[in-house]
Amino acid sequence: MPDPSFFTDEPQLTPLLRKLRSITRLSARDEQAILRLPAHPRVFTAGQDLVSEGDRSTQCWLVLMGWVQRYKLLSGGRRQISAFHVAGDMADLPSLHLPVMDHSLGAVTYVMAASIPHEALRELLERHPDLNAPFWRDTLVDAAIFREWVANVGRRPAYQRLAHLFCELYLKQAAVGLAQDHRCPMPVTQVDLADATGLTSVHINRTLRDLRRDKLIDLRSKTLVIHDWTRLVEAAEFDPTYLQLDRTLAA
């Protein structure tokens, strides 16, 4: 079900502004231009795809509420999750130039997302050339996150791998006002965490138990509580540089 706090008097595309403000500066004129983009909201239930691998896309999806996963399905139904997207993320911005999807975007939770036509985005960037840099920067940050996930899955041990993911997801949400005081939504299952980290769900369960034992985190009722941020960062060897956030958020 939708979070009642979503229904405010704010313009529909405010989450996108929050996301872009977290990684760059925007002029008032450019912000107003973004808010005027045509956007068509749609609701997705958990497990439903916003767009599937092989689809030819004519629009970008902006997450307004809920969690979306980027994933690929392999033979035998095996799944690899390569990103979690939250409110403010334009999860498939590269489709503006690469319209045939090489992955799928699926709803992890109840999701409200807005489709923004490619043509409208192209027109925005032509009329407001200063906005090319913020959107390009957003794409580059997305690529940096993907590189970090490759390192996470490929080289970090399980304990460090999961700790690193929790650090990232907390800061991503804090940057757009969805988390504070080292507490944030974490509406994923142990199977989701396994598919995002390349571990088994049994290994995830054991690693979560170890993180709790060490009094670093607690995860229950779809909420992550970080008991000791400094020690969690140390355990993960987490360097937030790749997120390119305001430094006060990463402290």
Model-derived regions: residue spans:
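Cyclic nucleotide-binding regulatory module and flanking cytosolic helices
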Residues: 1-46, 90, 95-97
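Short loop/turn motifs at secondary-structure junctions and domain boundaries
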Residues: 33-34, 51-54, 178
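Short aromatic/basic micro-patch
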Residues: 41, 84, 115, 187, ...
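Cyclic nucleotide-binding regulatory domains
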Residues: 48-110
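Alpha-helix/helix-capping structural signal
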Residues: 65, 119-120, 191, 230
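Cyclic-nucleotide recognition modules
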Residues: 83-148
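Polybasic "coupling" helices that flank or enter modular domains
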Residues: 126-198
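Phosphate-/nucleic-acid-contacting segments
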Residues: 171-251
